[in-house]
């Protein structure tokens, strides 16, 4: 009987221990690993929605929306706008809102100090649909950017396809032709003497000199 009672006591103790362990709550940290906070999920959802909205917008709509965004500083506006200029069609911007193309180009000219050199390639590829006052303002912007950083602009032009390269050189040559061409060439030659230009970059400078002599 004693042996039987001992066996029963051991069995009961084991059962009680199993029940106790099963009822013990899991540490909070374990739940935190498997479930993300609702606030984080909401933040990710909002960011995803914003990214989706930008993805669905055309280049023209994006540039216009950044230009109209009063919450951005001029520097931030310019950087966002120039990020999306490549391949833009200025006529489409006017279809969205009349006269905005000229307003935007003139704004970029006024804020040209904020245009980073790495965005020059995007600007070169933003010549579709330019005419009249638009073309004049665009040329003025390109000419000033070339004067500010000849190395970056020459490199960007050298890496362009023929159509965009020709258009870019033409705009710069037209803008610089308002000054004395001989003086402009002299300045460029002095700069060039201290550079190690590639063959393509030298071709850009030669083409620019030709354009200075015949800007129209």
Please give the residue ranges for each predicted region.
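Intrinsically disordered, low-complexity segments enriched in small/polar and acidic residues
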Residues: 34-35, 39, 48-50
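Intrinsically disordered, low-complexity segments
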Residues: 7, 36, 40-43
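Bacterial signal peptide processing site
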Residues: 24-26
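C-terminal motif of bacterial Sec signal peptides marking the signal peptidase cleavage site
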Residues: 19-22
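Non-catalytic all-alpha helical scaffold/repeat segments
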Residues: 43-216
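Bacterial N-terminal signal peptides that target proteins for export
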Residues: 2-11
């Amino acid at each position: 009987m004693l042996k039987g009672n001992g066996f029963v006591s051991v069995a009961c103790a084991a059962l009680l221990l199993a029940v106790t362990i099963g009822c013990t709550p899991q540490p909070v940290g374990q739940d935190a690993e498997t479930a993300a906070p609702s606030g984080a999920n909401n933040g990710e959802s909002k960011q995803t929605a914003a990214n989706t909205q930008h993805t669905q917008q055309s280049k023209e709509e994006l540039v216009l929306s950044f230009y109209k965004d009063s919450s951005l500083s001029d520097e931030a506006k310019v950087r966002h706008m120039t990020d999306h200029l490549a391949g833009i069609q200025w006529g489409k911007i006017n279809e969205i809102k009349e006269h905005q193309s000229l307003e935007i180009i003139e704004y970029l000219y006024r804020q040209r100090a904020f245009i980073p050199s790495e965005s020059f390639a995007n600007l070169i590829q933003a010549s579709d649909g330019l005419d009249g006052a638009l073309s004049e303002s665009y040329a003025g912007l390109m000419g000033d950017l070339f004067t500010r950083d000849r190395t970056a602009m020459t490199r960007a032009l050298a890496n362009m396809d023929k159509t965009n390269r020709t258009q870019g050189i033409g705009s710069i040559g037209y803008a610089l032709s308002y000054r004395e061409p001989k003086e402009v060439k002299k300045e460029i030659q002095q700069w060039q003497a201290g550079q190690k230009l590639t063959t393509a970059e030298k071709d850009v400078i030669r083409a620019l000199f030709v354009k200075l002599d015949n800007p129209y």
